[in-house]
Amino acid sequence: MTKRPEDTRVVVGMSGGVDSSVAALMLKEQGYDVIGIFMKNWDDTDENGVCTATEDYEDVIRVCNQIGIPYYAVNFEKQYWDKVFQYFLDEYKAGRTPNPDVMCNKEIKFKAFLEHALSLGADYLATGHYARVDRTGDEVKMLRGLDANKDQTYFLNQLTQEQLDKVMFPIGDLEKKRVRELAKEAELATATKKDSTGICFIGERNFKTFLSQYLPAQPGVMQTMDGEVKGEHDGLMYYTIGQRQGLGIGGSGDPWFVVGKDLEQNILFVEQGFHNPLLYSESISAVNISWTRPHIVGENGELTCTAKFRYRQEDHHVKVKMTGEQEAMVIFDEPVRAVTPGQAVVFYDGDECLGGGTIDDVFKDGQKLSYV
């Protein structure tokens, strides 16, 4: 950075949570010209009739007043509906398990919101994500957050070089425990507020109830691969590969898991055993691949690296073979359990997040598995 902090304007995306509150506090203490902005992306009254966005914005106002920075709210409900929620519904309709947080970061936080921040004369957009940006070389690199348990690069895999150039992650070098301590030391209003979970901006509501408002559920047969009927499912969209909870199959022996779906016949396939061979695959096809910087893949279109197929999963050694501009086959060194179409595959080289894509089809012994 060539500008001095006091001449550098940073817009902080504030959610009303402790992470973004501490991000804003740190930047203010470092001397930056900081503006706090709250994004309203969803008309969200929860099951109890409480509008959580109103509560969150009130917390943003309290924190901004405490640390002495201006604050605003912006509304991206239409963009969120068009770019994220519609995709989310379409994927569920297709029997897949989407990751709306990845799409939200790609289309809203680091696209629509970043553009808005730059239009306000901001030099950077900062968020409370657990990730790091390395600007020491010619290209900007995105690194995992220092707190391995909280690292969020999995959800940020679609960020491009142009976006990373304009982004700051102030808490990426901290452990969650330290973030809480800093908030308490500064007596921030959000210091003891619990972390939000649930879908990006939709929050912690009953998922089945929520989804059924938009997609009519179609109950059907739940059976083994040999055709033995085990009960009825509530609708294929409510189940994901490797799922154990909510199947309602009694009896003795090993627990039951979802091992496949037949969308045309509306059948949910289940089998017993956590390590059931049907849950393991050897390769995937991936689409919508994006790299965090150019020239990551060799001229032969291949790359050897590690990958995650779901959040907080250990890294798996893989070989990536590009089959198109944004498509690839990803071959695993060892079989991996419960790799699920619609989820993100994210590539790493040590601490660096190289990029990622969406899992399309899943293969074993050269055969496509009946995952949708």
Curated annotation (Swiss-Prot):
CDD domains attached to this UniProt entry: MnmA_TRMU-like
Gene: mnmA
EC id: 2.8.1.13
Site positions (Interaction with tRNA): 129, 343
A Pfam family annotated for this UniProt entry: tRNA_Me_trans
Gene Ontology molecular function: any one: tRNA-uridine 2-sulfurtransferase activity
GO biological process, one term: tRNA wobble position uridine thiolation
Chain segments carrying region Interaction with target base in tRNA: 99-101
GO CC annotation, single: cytoplasm
UniProtKB keywords: ATP-binding, Cytoplasm, Disulfide bond, Nucleotide-binding, RNA-binding, Transferase, tRNA processing, tRNA-binding
Name this polypeptide is given: tRNA-specific 2-thiouridylase MnmA
Family annotation (HAMAP family): tRNA_thiouridyl_MnmA
Region of interest: Interaction with tRNA: 150-152, 310-311
Residues annotated as catalytic: 104, 200
Main subcellular localisation: cytoplasm
